[in-house]
Amino acid sequence: MNKEAAIMSGLKWLNSFEAARNMAISTKKLVLIFFHSPSCNGCKKTLEKTFTDQDVADLLEGDFACVKYTVTQDENMTACYNVEWTPTFVITDSEGRELERWVGYLPPDEFITQVHLSEGLAEMHAKRFKAAEAAFEWIIDHKPDSEAAPEARYYMGVALYKDTGDARHLERTWETMNKRYPGNNWTKKAAAWS
């Protein structure tokens, strides 16, 4: 077994998008596609440091049907998702429609926060607002000082509004953000709701 195979064995990766699609349909999970390259240092760190973290593995296996592709070997999938840099993480629905993506290595703690943010955005794009709210709320409750927190708070307001149609959620979001994250770009965007 090569080093990559040994590292990747900690996570339960599915062997094809079709397998991920079937799992996503039967479990109502989203699909997470990990694009990597053998020559990419960020990919190596993701494999060796991030994916070996038990909290990362538990989150990914609990919330997603995970599949991985090597960009130099799986050129059709790489082209289909317009992967220009690695590592790239793409969240799709069960039909393969891209809902969200992010690029680049993150250590385990920041990776978990990014997963929650991207999962919330993906759920919102899929119009599953309660699931989006839960993902954003995780960041607000567990990582309130993270770089992702203002964006999560902003989109929590959007998800609540889209879920209920109640514009007061937007105004309360602005008020909370203005107190908690003054001067942040996401707070400036929320100022339209004041």
Predicted regions and their residues:
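Short solvent-exposed coil/turn linkers within tandem alpha-helical repeat scaffolds
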Residues: 54, 97, 101-107, 139-149, ...
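Thioredoxin-like thiol-disulfide oxidoreductase module
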Residues: 17-26, 52-118
